[in-house]
Structure formats: C-alpha cells, structure tokens
C-alpha cells in the first residue's frame, strides 16, 4: 500500500480513533483498581472494584463487618470512585472536626441535583451559599432562642400529643409524627399541624419515604463514578432518573404550596415571628432565589419532622420490650413530678434518666446509620495512607454505636450506659476531645445538624411527658419486631415499622391533668389560627 497516497484526513481519523480507544482502555483498566497507597479494603475486581459487593440496602451491616476485618478506616473502589468508610471515633474527630475546611463537602451527585437543583442544604456543596443559608438557620434556632421562645410551642404540642395518645391510642404510630411536624411547621412557617390527617404532614412523610430510598448508599446506579451508565436506557437500571425526578416534583409541589400560604397570609396583613417571615422580611438584605426559599423551608420541615418522631417511636417500642427500663423511668418521674402537672423542660436536670433513654435510642437505632456522605476537597494523608481529592467519606454511625469494645452487649437497650453523660448532645459534640462524644446521631463536623438544640428539647419534652402519663406494653398475643435487620424501614433514614402497642394511663387523676393542659395549650395554638 502506498501510504503517500493516503489522504491526511484519513490518517488523522485513524490517529484520533486510536487515541480514543487507548484512552478508553486506560480508563477501563483504572476503573475499580485500588492503588497501594489507599487504605486497605476488600478485594476488588477489574472495572467494578467493590461495587458488586456493596449491598443495595442496609450497607451499614456489611461495612461494620469490613471494619472489624480492615480497621476503623478502610477503602472501597466503586468504578472510578474512592469511598473511605470511617468507624474509628478518633479518626472521625481528627478529620471531620479538626480538618473540617476540607472534609465538609458533598460528593458530586447527579441524582441529588435532579431532585433539588443543588439548592438543598443537606446535599449542597460546601461554600459561600452553604455558609449563608446555614447562618440564616442558626440565627433562628440557636440555643438561646430555644431556651427563650421555642420551648413554649414544644410544650404545647407535647400536651396535645398526650391528649391524642389518650383519646386515639389506635393512631400511636402517627401522634409522634404530628407532634414533631407541628413544632417544625409552627416555628418555620407559622402553620400548625393540628391533626394526624393534615395534608402537609401526609405529603411530607410520603415524599420522605421515597427520598430516603433514592438517597440510600448503593440504591442508585453509580452514574457519578462511571459516567457511561448515564447513556444506558434508564429502564435497564431501575428507572433511577424517573425516581429522582418524581421525588423532586413532590418536594417542589409541597414546598411551593407552604411558601405560597405564608405569602398569602402576609398579603392579608397577618405577620408572625416565624422563621420564614423573618427570611422574607430580610430579602433585600439577604436576597434568595425562589428555589432557595422553597428548599430552605423544606430542609427544615424534613429534618425537624422525621428524626424526632422516629426516635420517639423507637423509644416507645423499646419500652414494650424492656419493662425494667420503663419502670425506672416511671420511678424517677414520680419522684420529681406529681399528678397535678406533666413534666416540662424545666425538669431536665432532675430527670437524668430520660436523657439517658434518649441517648441510648440514638445509639441503639440511629435514624441515619451511615449519615450523609461527605467528600474531601483535596488530597490528604492519614497514617501513611492517601485519601484522594474527591473521595466519598462515609460515617459508619452504626458501627461506632454498636462497637462491642466500647458498648457491652450493644444489641440491647441499656440507658445506664450514659450515666456519665448528663448534658445535652450539643455539649459533647462541641468538645475538643474525641472520647467525650456521646453519640453521632446528629452527624459531625461543620455539617452537624443545625437543629440539634431544638431536636434535643423535642425529644426530652415529648418522652418525659409520655412516660409520665402512660405505660406501654405489647398487646396480648402480639410481638413487635425490634430486630435491627428487619424491624425498621429501609433507606438512608430509618424508622420503626408499624408495631402494635397497648397504652395504659398510669393513674386515673392524670386524665384530668392531660385534658386541662390540653385546654391550656390552646392559648399557644391561637397564635397560629
């Protein structure tokens, strides 16, 4: 063949094609490969790495097994992605807290972007926008505001929760959800959730169930770490894109509707001291887009409604299985509070066992067993191993909470573990000492839950009142499933599955107190009519 006669365009095409093929081969050969400088981990296979070994649901169980084998920090290769799983509390402190400037980012996620357009604080990248929105939330929900004002709404809603458990015990799975949702919506929007059949509450928990499933680690095809998957028909990969878009549409519909109601009220000249009222009052000083406004209210509605209610339901279920714990709580409450009133936030220091029960519920059944993944913004070295820039950082909350070297018989509900932790969780989260942390139910680093002060009071007030009023037990002939493997919903957020519960009023005179306090709560509720 006379190559001198070959057109230059043909030669150029061959070179470009060859280069493309070589590039693709290099890409495919690198995919799934674990370089020796990474932390150790389970054996990889070409292309996939460890992707096929990562469970599609409840990965925290497998991650905890791997942590025992490979240590408190191990790595997974998921196609081109490097995932670092941390189960070591000391490492958690030294990386996420002490190096928070590089460990506060989120992994790039097409699914999260499809759902939220990257305006949701939970999945938003760390930067100026995140800091600005976080500051707005902090200013309203910081501890002095909870101590001075917000507790009044919490007390009133807890009084209704007692009334609802007394008069509608068959809806015991819904009352904690209404309680936490009404506190949140009242403070954020100035809108109460008056009944368990409230439209906004139904829509929120419906979308939260779907979002939890979509966001769970391993549940969605790894389209971010292996981009070629994006071009495949999505029906081959579980319709991942349609599922994400559906969740986004549900969020937009609900959050727009609630925001519109706030604006309509303000147009009628009715202003309230709610979070969203303050944000709208300050739009000239701190301008926000319409989408930012929707998701700013939405993220608070989600976080404030789901975590507290899931933990209260966990505690009630634990009381049915551990009657000795319930009896000890009853005895302490009875020694401090009579029948003429129910416990209040002012009783916190005198009821340390209630605080222990709450901490143990966080440890025993964490709402988010793997937290929300972080990402590292630049290369970092830990103990002579490399954590590459862009790596996904997973907090194995479950593994830390069920570490038998720290907690004896971790599968059992034993509140006395926390006898030496009398303060609120925020105190230990702020400690500079890694071994002083009580639990990781609120996350770690700069991404720690901004509503931690409100949530701690939600839980104490609600649980103290419920245990003052009632004795919870399993119905005759019925046994609820408290198994960690099968007793809770799947997703990145966990809640106990529906369970039966027999509810007995502890003393006849408490009925009168419950009804009277419910009537007194109407004075607070009238602010939201």
Swiss-Prot record:
It catalyses: 3-hydroxybenzyl alcohol + reduced [NADPH--hemoprotein reductase] + O2 = gentisyl alcohol + oxidized [NADPH--hemoprotein reductase] + H2O + H(+). Residues 26-529 are lumenal. The chain crosses the membrane at residues 9-25. It is found in: Endoplasmic reticulum membrane. InterPro entries: Cyt_P450, Cyt_P450_E_grp-I, Cyt_P450_sf, Cytochrome_P450_fung. Coiled coil: none annotated. Pathway: Mycotoxin biosynthesis; patulin biosynthesis. The keyword Membrane applies. Glycans are attached at residues 81, 383. Pfam families: p450. GO terms for biological process: patulin biosynthetic process. Its cofactor is heme. GO terms for cellular component: endoplasmic reticulum; endoplasmic reticulum membrane. Residues 1-8 are cytoplasmic. CDD domains: CYP64-like (cd11065). It is a single-pass membrane protein. Heme binds at residue 449. One of its GO terms (molecular function) is oxidoreductase activity, acting on paired donors, with incorporation or reduction of molecular oxygen. Keywords: Endoplasmic reticulum, Glycoprotein, Heme, Iron, Membrane, Metal-binding, Monooxygenase, Oxidoreductase, Transmembrane, Transmembrane helix. Its EC number is 1.-.-.-. Patulin was originally used as an antibiotic and specifically trialed to be used against the common cold, but it is no longer used for that purpose since it has been shown to induce immunological, neurological and gastrointestinal effects. Genotoxic effects of patulin with dose-dependent increase in DNA strand breaks in brain, liver and kidneys have been detected in mice. However, more recently, it has been proposed that patulin might also have anti-tumor properties. It comes from the Eukaryota. SUPFAM superfamilies: Cytochrome P450. Belongs to the cytochrome P450 family. Cytochrome P450 monooxygenase; part of the gene cluster that mediates the biosynthesis of patulin, an acetate-derived tetraketide mycotoxin produced by several fungal species that shows antimicrobial properties against several bacteria. PatI catalyzes the conversion of m-hydroxybenzyl alcohol into gentisyl alcohol. The pathway begins with the synthesis of 6-methylsalicylic acid by the polyketide synthase (PKS) patK via condensation of acetate and malonate units. This is Cytochrome P450 monooxygenase patI. It comes from Aspergillus clavatus (strain ATCC 1007 / CBS 513.65 / DSM 816 / NCTC 3887 / NRRL 1 / QM 1276 / 107). The lineage of its organism: Eukaryota, Fungi, Dikarya, Ascomycota, Pezizomycotina. The gene is patI.
């Amino acid at each position: 063949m006379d190559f001198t006669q070959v057109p230059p365009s043909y030669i150029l095409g061959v070179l470009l094609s060859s280069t493309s093929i070589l590039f693709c081969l290099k890409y495919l050969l690198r995919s799934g490969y674990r370089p020796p400088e990474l932390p150790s981990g389970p054996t990889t296979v070409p292309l996939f790495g460890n992707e096929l070994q990562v469970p599609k649901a409840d990965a925290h169980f497998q991650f905890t097994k791997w942590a025992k084998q490979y240590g408190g920090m191990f790595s997974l290769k998921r196609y081109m992605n490097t995932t670092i799983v941390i189960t070591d509390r000391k490492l958690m402190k030294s990386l996420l807290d002490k190096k928070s400037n590089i460990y506060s980012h989120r992994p790039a996620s097409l699914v999260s972007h499809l759902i939220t357009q990257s305006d949701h604080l939970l999945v938003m990248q760390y930067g100026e926008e995140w800091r600005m929105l976080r500051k707005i939330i902090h200013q309203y929900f910081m501890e002095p505001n909870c101590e001075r004002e917000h507790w009044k709404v919490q007390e009133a809603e807890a009084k209704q929760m007692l009334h609802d458990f007394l008069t509608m015990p068959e809806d015991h799975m819904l009352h904690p959800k209404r309680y936490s949702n009404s506190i949140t919506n009242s403070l954020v929007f100035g809108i109460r959730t008056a009944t368990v059949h409230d439209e906004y509450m139904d829509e929120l928990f419906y979308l939260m169930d779907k979002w939890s499933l979509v966001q769970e680690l391993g549940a969605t095809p790894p389209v971010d770490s292996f981009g070629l998957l994006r071009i495949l028909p999505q029906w081959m990969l579980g319709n991942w894109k349609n599922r994400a878009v559906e969740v986004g549409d549900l969020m937009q519909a609900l959050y727009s509707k609630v925001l519109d109601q706030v604006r309509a009220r303000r147009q009628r000249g009715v202003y309230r001291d709610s979070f969203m009222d303050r944000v709208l009052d300050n739009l000239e000083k701190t301008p926000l887009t319409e989408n930012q406004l929707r998701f700013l209210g939405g993220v608070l509605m989600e976080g404030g409604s789901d975590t507290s209610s899931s933990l209260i339901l966990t505690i009630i279920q634990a009381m049915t299985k551990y009657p000795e714990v319930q009896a000890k709580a009853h005895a302490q409450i009875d020694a401090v509070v009579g029948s003429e009133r129910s416990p209040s936030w002012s009783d916190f220091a005198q009821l340390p066992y209630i605080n222990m029960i709450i901490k143990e519920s966080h440890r025993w059944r964490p709402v988010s067993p793997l937290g929300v993944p972080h990402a590292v913004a630049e290369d970092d070295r830990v103990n002579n191993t490399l954590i590459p820039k862009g790596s996904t950082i997973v907090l194995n909350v479950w593994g830390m909470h069920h570490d038998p070297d720290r907690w004896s018989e971790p599968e059992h509900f034993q509140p006395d573990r926390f006898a030496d932790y009398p303060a609120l969780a925020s105190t230990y989260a702020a400690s500079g000492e890694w071994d002083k942390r009580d639990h990781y139910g609120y996350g770690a680093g700069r991404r720690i839950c901004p509503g931690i002060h409100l949530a701690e009071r939600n839980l104490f007030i609600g649980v103290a009142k419920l245990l003052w009023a009632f004795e919870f037990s399993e119905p005759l002939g019925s046994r609820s499933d408290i198994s960690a493997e099968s007793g809770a919903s799947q997703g990145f957020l966990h809640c106990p599955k529906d369970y039966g519960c027999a509810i007995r009023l502890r003393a006849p005179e408490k009925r009168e107190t419950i009804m009277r306090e419910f009537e007194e709560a109407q004075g607070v509720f009238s602010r939201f009519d």
